[in-house]
Swiss-Prot record:
Family: Belongs to the RuvB family.
Classification of source organism: Bacteria, Pseudomonadati, Pseudomonadota, Betaproteobacteria, Burkholderiales
Protein name per Swiss-Prot or TrEMBL: Holliday junction branch migration complex subunit RuvB
Keyword DNA repair: yes
Keyword DNA-binding: yes
NCBIfam families recorded: PRK00080.1, ruvB
Binding annotation for DNA: R301, R320, R325
The protein's assembly and partners: Homohexamer. Forms an RuvA(8)-RuvB(12)-Holliday junction (HJ) complex. HJ DNA is sandwiched between 2 RuvA tetramers; dsDNA enters through RuvA and exits via RuvB. An RuvB hexamer assembles on each DNA strand where it exits the tetramer. Each RuvB hexamer is contacted by two RuvA subunits (via domain III) on 2 adjacent RuvB subunits; this complex drives branch migration. In the full resolvosome a probable DNA-RuvA(4)-RuvB(12)-RuvC(2) complex forms which resolves the HJ.
The protein's enzyme class: hydrolase
Source organism: Burkholderia lata (strain ATCC 17760 / DSM 23089 / LMG 22485 / NCIMB 9086 / R18194 / 383)
InterPro entries hit by this protein: AAA+_ATPase (IPR003593), AAA_lid_4 (IPR041445), DNA_helicase_Holl-junc_RuvB (IPR004605), P-loop_NTPase (IPR027417), RuvB-like_N (IPR008824), RuvB_C (IPR008823), WH-like_DNA-bd_sf (IPR036388), WH_DNA-bd_sf (IPR036390)
SMART domains xref list: AAA
Reactions mediated catalytically: ATP + H2O = ADP + phosphate + H(+)
Length: 356
């Protein structure tokens, strides 16, 4: 068994967060530029088409937009598309960068009419900055303090009408006053294999990589429902195809490349398997407490809860119960193990989503 550490966690090939600034540059080159080119998220895309067209006809700024959902699903891409479809400029920042009220005021006062301000990780705004944002969103005004001490006074500045697009992976951490100021709220969902296959084929075309439909589907099925992961795997499979094959990405070539990268047919890597195997072999399938599990695999509790578990739970391989983590029937089948007769089904620990 290969041991992993925090650095390895951050560098997982199937991580949904950007691995480096270099990867972010690569992502920008592959981003769709119009809603018509945006694959998936049909409901969100349909809503935005109507709202954007209505705002353009009235020559008004688009209502403020909140995009939330797991990382890597296209929130930043949608923000850029919104600005491009509206025909305006986009200014981009993130919640942690805006440390002081003056940082936000400088951005707001430099916006032109109907511009888009995109704040990523908006749930990480400081309370001081958030207070400045409220009147800006409602009345296109901000209050700034001039002077210090007893001579200090508040001055109200008028702003150009603008659209705030906020993105977050943790909508529950937004304060109610901030959430209520967004007129358009959209949740981005995980993609299915067919949608990801279309994304892979489009990206391969932009990269001048030769890929057949089955090769694209093989990559898509292991991409954990996330376009960012699909594009990252495509790059690595392309490298493999150029060196070990004739450059053509087929299903067999993709399978061999992904096996070399330790990405299995359901998108698990070594860390996923390490966690599930610990539950199966060290704790007899569970239940096991999170602290015991963290000690057993040498990972931090937060890493397990925030990085490893969400996908495993979402796909039905892991259950959180009041007594601890439990491997599901699907996990036993995935590892080719017989299911022990321990009465867990009667206790509700192995119920499948349909109750069977």
């Amino acid at each position: 068994m290969i041991e992993t550490d925090k650095l390895a966690t951050e560098q997982r090939i199937i991580a949904a967060t950007p691995a480096s600034s270099h990867e972010e540059v690569f992502e920008r080159a592959l981003r769709p530029r119009q809603l018509d080119d945006y694959v998936g998220q049909e409901k969100v895309r349909g809503q935005l088409e109507i709202f954007i067209e209505a705002a353009k006809r009235r020559s008004e700024p688009l209502d403020h937009v909140l995009l939330f959902g797991p990382p890597g699903l296209g929130k930043t891409t949608l923000a850029h598309i919104i600005a491009r479809e509206m025909g305006v400029n986009l200014r981009q920042t993130s919640g942690p960068v805006l440390e002081r009220a003056g940082d936000l005021a400088a951005l707001l006062t430099n916006l032109e009419a109907n511009d888009v301000l995109f704040i990523d990780e908006i749930h990480r705004l400081s309370p001081v900055v958030e207070e400045i944002l409220y009147p800006a969103l409602e009345d296109y005004q901000i209050d700034i303090m001039i002077g210090e001490g007893p001579a200090a006074r508040s001055v109200k500045l008028d702003l150009q009408p603008f659209t705030l697009v906020g993105a977050t992976t943790r909508a529950g951490m937004l304060t109610n006053p901030l959430r209520d100021r967004f007129g358009i709220v959209a949740r981005l969902e995980f993609y299915d294999a067919e949608q990801l296959s279309r994304i892979v084929r489009r990206s391969a075309s932009l990269l001048n990589a030769q890929i057949d439909p089955n090769g694209a589907l093989e990559i898509a099925k292991r991409s954990r429902g996330t376009p960012r992961i699909a594009n990252r795997l495509l790059r690595r499979v392309r490298d493999f195809a150029e060196v070990k094959a004739d450059g053509q990405i087929t299903a067999a070539v993709a399978d061999a490349a992904l096996a070399m990268l330790d990405v299995d047919p359901v998108g698990f890597d070594l860390m996923d398997r390490k966690l599930l195997e610990a539950i199966l072999y060290k704790f007899d399938g569970g239940p096991v407490g999170i602290d015991n599990l963290a000690a057993a695999i040498g990972e931090e509790r937060d890493t397990i809860e925030d990085v490893l578990e969400p996908y495993l739970i979402q796909q039905g391989f892991l259950q959180r119960t009041p007594r601890g983590r439990v491997a599901t029937l699907l996990t036993y089948r995935h590892f080719g193990l017989s299911v022990p007769d321990t009465g867990r089904t009667e206790r509700g620990e192995w119920d499948t989503p349909d109750g069977k």
